From Swiss-Prot:
Name of the gene: hisS
Organism: Azobacteroides pseudotrichonymphae genomovar. CFP2
Protein's UniProt name: Histidine--tRNA ligase
Molecular function terms from GO: ATP binding; histidine-tRNA ligase activity
Keyword Ligase: yes
Subunit structure comment from the entry: Homodimer.
Keywords annotated in UniProt: Aminoacyl-tRNA synthetase, ATP-binding, Cytoplasm, Ligase, Nucleotide-binding, Protein biosynthesis
Sequence similarity: Belongs to the class-II aminoacyl-tRNA synthetase family.
Length: 458
């Protein structure tokens, strides 16, 4: 027999695991609805012209590209083939790719459907994305993102609302977190005062790795990217900035006083914190100057969330993008959004055993199959139970009761109904409680009430 496997960085999920994952999705979805967001979906495939050049050079390398259909090799330029010109070859043999995230597809969606959309457009999306990353703990090549974005509004109240959503979702999931926020305008201001404006992408890419690789490695990378030693020395106080959120803001106002864009970013951060001070939040919200988020399209506030109890990397990221739809021809449309990493949240809940009882959606009663006469009696009963929302099954084969009870046990079905000739004659059903092994009879007209009560008591 062929040895079967799945690609590295991907996973199968059993029914039990899907119950847990749906608990996560349902929790996040319910909070999104609470704040007025509406759901959309976009294709797994996007044209490479939509995807390439928008994430930055490093992240472009992580795109999964799909070979063109048919005899695509015959259309390749022989010179590029013989000279191993991979970048040129890619354009000739691949026109489509798997989406890297849900933000660029959103920008494409907004531009294509702008005449159908009411702005501000509050959308959420729960779908898988793919990245050709090196698989490791907490890092997958296929994973689900749960995004919420507000497009068509530059109000900082949107940032405040998104932080409330973050706080509420993780509270409902019982996960303790730290919420980090920063502003790309502040980072631009820092690059400006150290005279390295043209190297802003290199600086922010390196800064974003500070938590992962440490200060020494970040400084080495900055040097390799051509940042001057003098500029790197000027960056050190920013890397090491400590104190309360307000103290950091006050300190930076003095340092960045000659940078209008830097001051603008500080004013935005300060406004967000002032509004948050009016609202009770359950988790720590920290102004972290080293938070950069590697994606090129962020222009204002940026978010990142980490779990305090499990070392697994970030479980949420996001930020404001003022120019994202510009690349598709629609200007002056600001947006801001967040993205929950559902797969890392799934791993955290597993590790901390934080899942509630998820059996409420399972089958509540299995009817044993004892033959044709019993089946004819059971089918109308099944219909009545399902009609009022009680999950019920009939075993499809007339086989040994032991086998049917084993099926109920393995599928965690709490009740088994036995209908023999006596039950049919008396219009009753014998119920076996699989949890306590007790057994009792119940009149047919009392069956629905019994299970509705059982469901409420779960």
């Amino acid at each position: 027999m062929q040895k079967l496997s799945i690609p590295k960085g991907t996973r199968d999920f059993t029914p039990c695991e899907m119950d847990k994952r749906n608990y996560i999705f349902d929790t996040i979805r319910s909070v999104f609805y609470l704040y007025g967001f509406k759901q959309i979906e976009t294709p797994a495939l996007e044209n490479l012209s939509t995807l390439l050049g928008k994430y930055g050079e490093e992240n472009d390398k992580l795109l999964f590209k799909i070979l063109n259909s048919g005899d695509f090799i015959s259309k390749v330029n022989p010179i590029d083939w013989n000279n191993h010109q991979l970048s040129k070859l890619t354009k000739q043999i691949s026109k489509k790719g798997l989406r890297y995230d849900l933000t660029l597809p959103l920008a494409r969606f907004v531009v294509m459907h702008r005449n159908e959309i009411t702005f501000p457009f509050k959308r959420f999306q729960i779908q898988p994305v793919w990245r050709s990353d090196r698989p490791q703990k907490g890092r997958y090549r296929e994973f689900v993102q749960c995004d919420a974005d507000i497009v068509g509004s530059d109000s900082l109240l949107n940032e405040v609302e998104l932080i409330q959503i973050i706080d509420e979702v993780f509270h409902r999931l019982s996960i303790s977190i730290s919420i980090k926020i920063n502003n790309r305008k502040i980072l631009n201001g820092i690059a400006e005062i150290i005279s390295e404006e043209k190297k802003i992408t290199d600086i922010t890419t390196a800064m974003d790795k500070l938590d992962k690789v440490g200060l020494t490695k970040v400084n080495e990378e900055l040097l390799q990217k051509g940042i001057s030693i003098q500029a790197i020395d000027q960056l050190q106080p920013f890397f090491l900035l400590k104190g309360s959120n307000q103290n950091k803001i006050s300190t930076l106002k003095n340092i960045l006083s000659t940078s209008p864009i830097g001051i603008k970013g500080l004013q935005e951060i300060e406004t967000i914190f002032n509004k948050l001070n009016l609202i009770p939040t359950r988790n720590t919200i920290k102004f972290d100057l080293t938070l950069a988020r590697g994606l090129n399209y962020y222009t204002g506030t940026i978010f990142e969330v980490k779990c305090l109890n499990v070392p697994i990397g970030s479980v949420l990221g996001g930020g404001r993008y003022d120019n994202l739809t510009n690349i598709f021809g629609l200007s002056n449309l600001s947006g801001v959004g967040i993205s929950f990493g559902a797969d890392r949240i799934f791993d955290i809940l597993n590790q901390l055993n934080l899942y509630p009882n998820t059996n409420a959606s399972h089958t509540q009663i299995l009817f044993v199959n004892l033959g044709e006469k019993g089946v004819d009696f059971i089918l109308p009963v099944l219909f009545s139970l399902r009609k009022v929302g009680i999950n019920a099954e009939l075993y499809p084969h007339n086989t040994k009761i032991k086998k049917q009870l084993s099926y109920a046990h393995n599928n965690q079905i709490p009740f088994v109904a036995i209908v023999g000739s006596t039950e049919i004659a008396e219009n009753k059903i014998t119920i076996k409680d699989m949890r306590s092994c007790s057994q009792f009879s119940i009149a047919l007209d009392k069956l629905i009430n019994f299970f509705q009560y059982e469901r409420q008591s779960v």
